[in-house]
Amino acid sequence: MVKTLYEKLFDSHIVYEAEGETPILYINRHLIHEVTSPQAFDGLRVANRQVRQVNKTFGTMDHSISTQVRDVNKLEGQAKIQVLELDKNTKATGIKLFDITTKEQGIVHVMGPEQGLTLPGMTIVCGDSHTATHGAFGALAFGIGTSEVEHVLATQTLKQARAKSMKIEVRGKVASGITAKDIILAIIGKTTMAGGTGHVVEFCGEAIRDLSMEGRMTVCNMAIEMGAKAGLIAPDETTFAYLKDRPHAPKGKDWDDAVAYWKTLQSDDDAQFDTVVTLEAKDIAPQVTWGTNPGQVISVNETIPNPQEMADLVQRASAEKALHYIGLEAGTNLKEVKVDQVFIGSCTNSRIEDLRAAAAVMKGRKKADNVKRILVVPGSGLVKEQAEKEGLDKIFIAAGAEWRNPGCSMCLGMNDDRLGEWERCASTSNRNFEGRQGRNGRTHLVSPAMAAAAGMFGKFVDIREVALN
């Protein structure tokens, strides 16, 4: 029987299935952080249950921590409570924790792959919507709620209904200067933010294969932003090269056996997908969101669309509301839009390749006078260490940016990195919802190079026209 990659992953993890009932899946890897885990551990204590498989769960601190201090005692309010609770709960249960005193600590979706915890063929869950990131390795990875976090801790299983399958093929090669972030934003622009609803998406095509693992993680990270349950990219030699010798990756004969199995994790040639979407890579230009969801996105060289010209009444109403909030008018050229802040970071774009791309733009330049602040936040302590080894931190600081410690930072208004009211930000994060980066903050999603350029020129520019150093 021919199967898609998703079907192979799903079927191979079924623990129990009966007619008329939702299948129960075995979970290979459970990642936790300080925000969605405290109530789950409380639930275990109330029910007098233990963590079933301690060695399958790993924790880190990322969402609410400060990127300015590494001392828990200097945290305030809810952030301090959450961090201390995670520390207490992991010590009590024996779960491995990468806390803020270690260089292995980082954003959960950066730390997991770095440590080799993310492997092809796995089922991976986390109490975070961007768990789809790990699908870049050919793993079935998706976000879960706090009650499900408790269930996985207690049983190492999860009830999960089958999703539909979608194939998104990006044909050919992208032009110079076009990144994984541009590819996924262009995809969401075509499908809309609801285009993948009810589906698990497999990304394929030459443009996807050409991406590094870091680029592939960027693509899968934002699968949720088109409404998909998860995103997948079949593993290949690029995947294996990235994983080899990672701390938790198989070693010796186990590695050889694992690679032999991983090579089978491909959709069969005649596999049927419920939905197929194709894009031509050559048509993708640098992308900038203009509204309040990632599907409201255009090329930097285009003008903001007129809601009155939209045939769909729901889309029209959404666009009108978005433009009112974002403070822009239909017909505006994006290259005329000035920014107040720049954020380079998040689980979408805080890896070493992202920082190198930003540094290439910022080297030898200075922050524009109208830009109040540029935050550069590495995704983990190991990324920070590598960036400093390469001297990237000095480039950022010389350009007028702030070089921070690892954390989710300004991706979400849950810590002390926030936009001021009605400030406009060029951000490498994954969501531009109303208030996402702070009360009444205005967010435009872009690639790291585009964000860095906005910081240097004070407005959006076409990165293809910027000399790199």
Swiss-Prot record:
It comes from the Bacteria. Binds 1 [4Fe-4S] cluster per subunit. GO terms for biological process: L-leucine biosynthetic process. InterPro entries: 3-IsopropMal_deHydase_lsu, Acnase/IPM_dHydase_lsu_aba_1/3, Acoase/IPM_deHydtase_lsu_aba, Aconitase_4Fe-4S_BS, Aconitase_4Fe-4S_dom, IPM_dehydratase_rel_enz, IPMI_cat. Its cofactor is [4Fe-4S] cluster. It catalyses: (2R,3S)-3-isopropylmalate = (2S)-2-isopropylmalate. Keywords: 4Fe-4S, Amino-acid biosynthesis, Branched-chain amino acid biosynthesis, Iron, Iron-sulfur, Leucine biosynthesis, Lyase, Metal-binding. NCBIfam families: leuC, PRK05478.1, PRK12466.1. Catalyzes the isomerization between 2-isopropylmalate and 3-isopropylmalate, via the formation of 2-isopropylmaleate. Heterodimer of LeuC and LeuD. This is 3-isopropylmalate dehydratase large subunit. It comes from Haemophilus influenzae (strain PittEE).
